[in-house]
Amino acid sequence: MRRQVMNSGARPTATPSTIIAPISGLNIRDPLANMQSRYALVLDNFFPRASDLQLRKGYVLYSSCYDIDKKDRPPFVRLLSYAPATYKGNCLFAVSDEGFIKLDTNKNTAPVLKIDSPATNGLWQSVNFSNGGGDWLWCCCGDGVNKARVYDGTKWTILDSASTPALDYSTEWVDVCSFKRRLWLARRNSDVLYYLDVLAIAGVEKKENTTLYSLPLGSLWNRGGSIIKIMNLTLDSGSGADDYLCIFSTEGQVAVYKGNNPNNDNDWGLVGIYDIPKPLSANCFIKYGGDIILMTENGLLAFSEMFQTIEIKHSIMSSAIIHNAWLEAVDRLRLIGKEKGLTLQQVGQYCSLCLYGEQNMLICNFLHDFRSDGETGAYIQYVLNTESRAWCRFKDLHMSAFTNHRDSVYCVADRYFYKFWEGYTDNKNFITAIMKTAYMFPSGRGTNSRITLIRPTFQTQILDVKYSLVIDSDYKELQRLRTPRTMAVSPLGIWDEAIWDDAFWVGTPRVSQDWTTINHYIGKAISLRLKVAAKGQDIALVGFDLITQSGGMI
């Protein structure tokens, strides 16, 4: 007679578990022993999305502006977008210490070597401005040598006291902003704000028939300093949108005005003065919706949060979770400045912000090593997912400038022009990504664990996944990531040969899952460290499955 086998009650020796990819992004703030598993300690070249980590896309060469006969020509340091009301005539200008070069965003264009507008400095600011008489790209440098200029879609016009229309202080303008149908100007080493007549693109300051007006701000700023940036802020106060003009100082103070006509006291007034961390440079500001986002020496800042808050709180800064990494990047800028005899804000001119709305991506581009003659320096990027507020870091992108032009992002390095987030290689080179999860306790706090089997889950479309994986125990990295190995994925379906309903067709996202054994030091706290190398394929990390054996407390 058969009898049921009685359960001995023995505790299972191995337990399964699943870990999702750290989609909440990089975390350099929380204690290692108390960090949630949805965060990563290292996240290089992975972009955190809502449900996975995407291997960042690459860039493709669009045009070379490299002259083999003049190898010491200066690199590009700015990309300026000309975006007229009609699509016709839109273009990009790459700027170096030689001047402006017009770039065509049509793929595979011939090399471009012509200087459209000569200059001796590449650090320019610009604004697009339409006044009925044309669509203008208004540019200024403010170095005391290079004159302000405008581009109308066909030609450049230098603005100075002898031009038509005339402009005073042409070589001294360091920033320009469009607000309430006027152009507002900041003068080099000055705390005086200037503005032009409505719809005017130039003006002169004189006793009679003045067309260039001034508004002193020095008495409002108790920290001193000069104007570094002018931006407009749009907020909804509950009764409709309100527009404000925000004037930022080099010392970290902001004068905010509201109104339509600065020449009429009844239609113009000071809203308040606000203290913020010092901006890195005039090049480190960007509009995001109606808000102003800026890179400061203490982190990334959304000015609307300061504007609507009585006291400054560190937690409202978007970069609080990577605060220490941000400070290290700023300290690196200070070191570069010390070596070159430059201030932090002068070195900060080589840093920048770029918003890529289609990918919910905000790129904070940091100079990491100063250039030598004819070469772009080394750069790193801290990147924010603007939807989830998750951070990551991009590496191996030594781009001196990024810009969003007609919903695509372009970048420059040395004298080469690229389209970013295009394809799955870095100009035909491998893209390598590294991730390290937060430390976790598979068997509970205080109990030793041994991972006997592990299965990473990837989604990919074309090729096998090359990866390397190690396990770090008890907050120590005792193993190094080796050359990535290949994980096989399901074969692609071939017409007339594949089995219908079973095979995966080309372009279909496929799941890569392979159990593998892994050797590691037994410990209570476990972290997974992964390296992926890819060339020509889209890869997303979904998570990991683990088989764990539990041990004792010692």
PLM segments and residue spans:
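N-terminal beta-propeller domains
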Residues: 1-112, 172-257, 335-384, 416
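Repeated scaffold domains used in trafficking and secretory/extracellular systems
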Residues: 72-83, 119-132, 166-178, 227-231, ...
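Beta-strand initiation motifs
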Residues: 107-112, 155-158, 202-211, 262-271, ...
